[in-house]
């Protein structure tokens, strides 16, 4: 398996002395596509999804549900109700 094609997705790993990162209990490295999505959320959709009735909230909720369905298909789940987002592994357990 050629990991170099995956490493290029993570900006920090493309520095001259790109680290070997072993502190995933503290923070998970994010690929550029995730960094871009987070930046887009904070600049265009600064709202809480699933609990407010204004347009921005609806857009956030729709984005979450699209992500949930993408994960459902990727994982082979029968229903999106099987896909649950939590803030960390401890909470998820």
Question: For each predicted feature, which ranges?
Answer:
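Pyridoxal 5′-phosphate
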Residues: 1-93
């Amino acid at each position: 398996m050629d990991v170099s094609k995956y490493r290029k997705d993570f900006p920090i790993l493309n520095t001259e002395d790109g680290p070997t990162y072993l502190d995933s209990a503290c923070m998970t490295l994010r690929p550029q596509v995730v960094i871009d999505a987070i930046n887009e959320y904070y600049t265009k959709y600064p709202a809480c999804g699933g609990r407010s009735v204004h347009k921005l909230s609806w857009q956030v909720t729709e984005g979450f549900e699209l992500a949930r369905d993408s994960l459902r298909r990727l994982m082979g789940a029968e229903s999106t109700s099987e896909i649950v987002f939590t803030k960390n592994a401890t909470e998820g357990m």
